[in-house]
Amino acid sequence: MLDSKLLRGQLQEVADRLASRGFSLDVARIESLEERRKAVQTRTEQLQAERNARSKSIGQAKAKGEDIAPLMADVERMANELAAGKAELDAIQAELDGILLTIPNLPDASVPVGASEDDNVEVRRWGTPKAFDFEIKDHVALGEISGGLDFEAAAKLSGARFAVLRGPVARLHRALAQFMINLHTGEHGYEEHYTPYMVQAPALQGTGQLPKFEEDLFKITREGEADFYLIPTAEVSLTNLVAGEILDAKQLPLKLVAHTPCFRSEAGASGRDTRGMIRQHQFDKVEMVQVVEPSKSMEALEGLTANAERVLQLLELPYRVLALCTGDMGFGAVKTYDLEVWVPSQDKYREISSCSNCGDFQARRMQARWRNPETGKPELVHTLNGSGLAVGRTLVAVLENYQQADGSILVPEVLKPYMGGVEVIR
């Protein structure tokens, strides 16, 4: 969440910067609440001073043998007014805090200004899409040939947007996740974590999914107990490991990685990507999270993005990197790069990773801090997250880019050690 001081001192500037994201800040409402807050605070401070003076005069009057009943009545009246004033202050602050929780992060000055994904800026490309000399099949057709993808069985179990994987295709899916985890822990310096797949509301508020995006989440209601939510990404559980903590400078940067299933309702995706594994209610993802000193977060974003790119390079999958524009960035991001992998059957690049610097936005919500050795005081950390990668979409890319004319699939060289001798999926 944004620093409340920004809304008090730079409200119009904040509103202008948020407008570049397509977000309309209710300036009049915030100004009205702030004026009320100041007025009530001034009144309660004056009342407290008067009450203190009256309380002091009670002792003096008592020493002189004077009647203190009127003074006592005044003090009691002021105490009641003070309690009412503090309650009003708390209510105003709660309303301001509620507004803050719905305001997205401010984009960095380096982020391209734009309204939608059409305004994203391509930064670079890697690899060249293969020219096939036969009719390209999509991953659904390839899965039917091998028997490795079964969407009908999944629909019988769970409905639309699920998949059952079998045999070598299931093993290939597992191999991809193992390869990614081994790469990030072995070469990129991340520490592997196994975290809960269900979290409570404060964790989702900490990373920004709540309260604004509850409709995108799967919720488990429990009578008499706190509700659970299925994680939409391991970003939630990994990042919240530092919630409420004050980290030593020597602990930074923290680099965490986890392989988990992710669960999303896809509430706004009706009619999009209904065929295949591109958009599912349940999918696996390897997630990278970094917690860093504020001055190093932009450098860390470049490194995080390079870590995700390395997966695609070793798999020899063509991809491109986009700098997202202000209107297409996620709620909590200061700056985001998307990686898009080439999908032959669609003749275009599709998103496979999103790498974001969230600045102190999540840290403020979580109260995640580090002790700055220069000041000796606790300060907010910066947090970053990125997919390294979405396993299901990577499987789609491998199946389609490594397909042969007969519908068989060559296993990428880097995955062969994980495939138990299987080099071709038929």
From Swiss-Prot:
Pathway(s) the chain acts in: Aminoacyl-tRNA biosynthesis; selenocysteinyl-tRNA(Sec) biosynthesis; L-seryl-tRNA(Sec) from L-serine and tRNA(Sec): step 1/1
Pfam family, one: tRNA-synt_2b
Binding site for L-serine: T233, A234, E235, E287, S387
Gene3D superfamilies (UniProt xref): Bira Bifunctional Protein, Domain 2, Serine-tRNA synthetase, tRNA binding domain
Any one GO molecular-function label of the UniProt entry: ATP binding
InterPro entries xref list: aa-tRNA-synt_IIb, aa-tRNA-synth_II, aa-tRNA-synth_II/BPL/LPL, Ser-tRNA-ligase_type_1, Ser-tRNA-synth_1_N, SerRS_1_N_sf, SerRS_core, tRNA-bd_arm
Source superkingdom: Bacteria
Principal location: cytoplasm
Binding site for ATP: R264, S265, E266, E351, I352, S353, S354
Enzyme class: ligase
Keyword Protein biosynthesis among UniProt keywords: yes
This enzyme's EC code(s): 6.1.1.11
Annotated Gene Ontology cellular component terms: cytoplasm
Transmembrane segments: none
Catalytic reactions of this protein: tRNA(Ser) + L-serine + ATP = L-seryl-tRNA(Ser) + AMP + diphosphate + H(+); tRNA(Sec) + L-serine + ATP = L-seryl-tRNA(Sec) + AMP + diphosphate + H(+)
Localization annotation: Cytoplasm
Domain writeup: Consists of two distinct domains, a catalytic core and a N-terminal extension that is involved in tRNA binding.
Subunit structure: Homodimer. The tRNA molecule binds across the dimer.
Similarity remark: Belongs to the class-II aminoacyl-tRNA synthetase family. Type-1 seryl-tRNA synthetase subfamily.
Function: Catalyzes the attachment of serine to tRNA(Ser). Is also able to aminoacylate tRNA(Sec) with serine, to form the misacylated tRNA L-seryl-tRNA(Sec), which will be further converted into selenocysteinyl-tRNA(Sec).
Protein name per Swiss-Prot or TrEMBL: Serine--tRNA ligase
Gene name as annotated: serS
